[in-house]
Curated annotation (Swiss-Prot):
It is found in: Cytoplasm. Belongs to the TACO1 family. One of its GO terms (biological process) is regulation of DNA-templated transcription. This is Probable transcriptional regulatory protein CA_C2295. Its main location: cytoplasm. NCBIfam families: PRK00110.1, PRK12378.1, YebC/PmpR family DNA-binding transcriptional regulator. It comes from Clostridium acetobutylicum (strain ATCC 824 / DSM 792 / JCM 1419 / IAM 19013 / LMG 5710 / NBRC 13948 / NRRL B-527 / VKM B-1787 / 2291 / W). Pfam families: TACO1_YebC_N (PF20772), Transcrip_reg (PF01709).
């Protein structure tokens, strides 16, 4: 994926997070609760929970909200049991899409996701139809400022175990293997770096270059999917037109 497309995706996600902060906190809270249910509430012993908490902090989620989600997952507070489901399909212009869902009602979420695809120029596919086009990676984004030396940071993250380091318009984008994400993130935290975002994501092996019109159509489908309370993340292999602002 080109640097422009990576940074566009991050900007778009961050802009929506700022505009819909309460909804974003709810979605991250669900991830935290599921991480606790599957691996326990001890941060030291649960790397998935540590990753979720880091993601929450990068989104400026208050600690009391984070702690409440942990308690729900541990059964100390009343909560809901969520199931994780990955839907696969194609958007406009043949863009491959993965839709990550946490739901307490599979029928509702399946209906909502199918409706979004059908009404916005896409097609919901069978399991496995596009997953092979993506790899699970860690992605850490750090905002540029005068106190950060690019070469020094690049050497640090590569020493920490990162796979790739990219310098974009306003940020540095660090990519890791899934199994190295926690180690790299925690090493950067110890160096007092602050993150625009820090999360596991699905990175496409190849991208589909879009016209301005198709960029708008694909983004509309992404927006509709992300408006669903059950949808946690939407991954795709679109490379948006450089004139597209989202």
């Amino acid at each position: 994926m080109s640097g422009h497309s990576k940074w566009h995706n991050i900007q778009a996600k961050k802009g929506k997070a700022d505009a819909k902060r309460g909804k974003v906190f709810t979605k991250i809270g669900k991830e935290i609760a599921v991480a606790v249910k599957t691996g326990g509430a001890n941060l030291d012993a649960n790397s998935k929970l540590r990753d979720c908490v880091a993601k929450a902090k990068a989104a400026n989620m208050p600690m009391d909200t984070i702690n409440r989600a942990i308690k729900k997952g541990a059964g100390e507070l009343e909560g809901v049991n969520y199931e994780e489901i990955i839907y696969e399909g194609y958007g406009p212009a043949g863009v491959a899409m993965l839709v990550n869902v946490l739901t307490d009602n599979k029928n509702r979420s399946a209906s909502d996701v199918r409706y979004c695809f059908d009404r916005n120029g896409g097609n919901l596919g069978a399991s496995g139809c596009v997953a092979w086009m993506f790899q699970r990676k860690g992605q850490i984004v750090i905002e540029k400022n005068d106190s950060i030396d690019e070469d020094e940071l690049m050497m640090k993250v590569l020493d920490f175990g990162a796979e790739d380091f990219a310098s974009e318009e306003e940020v540095f984008i660090i990519t890791t293997a899934q199994e190295e994400f926690s180690n790299v993130r925690e090493a950067l935290e110890k160096e007092n770096f602050e993150f625009v975002s820090a999360e596991l994501t699905m990175v496409p092996d190849n991208t589909v270059k879009l016209s301005l019109e198709d960029s708008e159509r694909v983004q509309k489908l992404i927006d509709k999917l992300e408006d669903s309370d059950d949808v946690q993340d939407v991954y795709h292999n679109a490379e948006f037109d450089e004139a597209f602002e989202g």
